[in-house]
Amino acid sequence: MNKDHTTKRYVFVTLLNVVITIAEFLGGIFSGSLALLSDAVHNLSDVGAIILSFVAHLISRRSRNQHKTFGYERAETLAAFTNGVILIVISVVLFVEAIQRFWEPEHIHGGIMLVVSIIGLVTNLISMFAMHRDSKGNLNVRSTFIHMLSDALSSVAAVIGAIFIYFWNVTWLDPVLTILVSLFVLHEAYEITMKAANVLMESNPNIDLTKVNEIMLSFPEVKNVHHVHVWRYSDNFIMMDAHINVDRNLQAGELEQLYQKIGKKLKEELCINHITLQAECERGRNDKMIVSGRGNNEN
């Protein structure tokens, strides 16, 4: 992902969303459309979400130092998690408001709603496609893209609702479409939030530990594998550490070569980017791959 191009896209999308948010708020107030106001609220939240993602993107580019020896890449994961939570809250709020609108219907000016919603749809589609390219390999950009996608869907719902209201006065369609959009966004936001949470909790990124064990034990020098940890540091960087039991008479040079061979095979077959191995002779020889407890005695 080109960092400079991503930066330009963030700036462009932010400015575009500020303009459309103002337009949709005014249009929603004058038309009385909940779908249009919900779209405006989406856009307002998007402005904050985009700024948050952009700041995290800039922070993630900082170099490693004595205080952040791993670097700052997880700033983007934190931003993705925050944006996911924000999207969940917004979805729930819009769902509740739509239900209330069924019981307390208001007059809606379909003409104003239609014009403003079409403008919103066009700008939201532009924003969505601007962020789409970088959203595939970065959870932070993905969370921003989902914001854009949710707004585009809200705009589509607003356009459809405006047409039915303007020509046939079908006002109940406005809250129905809002409910459908809020449920879709809730589903997408939940997935992003859980993915970000798994990274922050250093969960196993679907690496088969049985396969890890088989690969390392395929080397005759390795007698046992224990205290294995595999986690995703960021979207595209998987790390692993493990203890291996080897013969006592193995020399330092031979041990280094063994590390290199194991590391190469793990990277080739399981796409693990960074591997740390600790060799032992007798200690832990009978331990399992995953040792129960909090691991305070690991060293």
Task: Name the predicted role of every residue range.
Residues 1-12, 35-37, 41, 45, ...:
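Alpha-helical transmembrane segments and adjacent TM-loop junctions that form the membrane-embedded core
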Residues 1-31:
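Histidine-rich, glycine-flanked metal-binding segment
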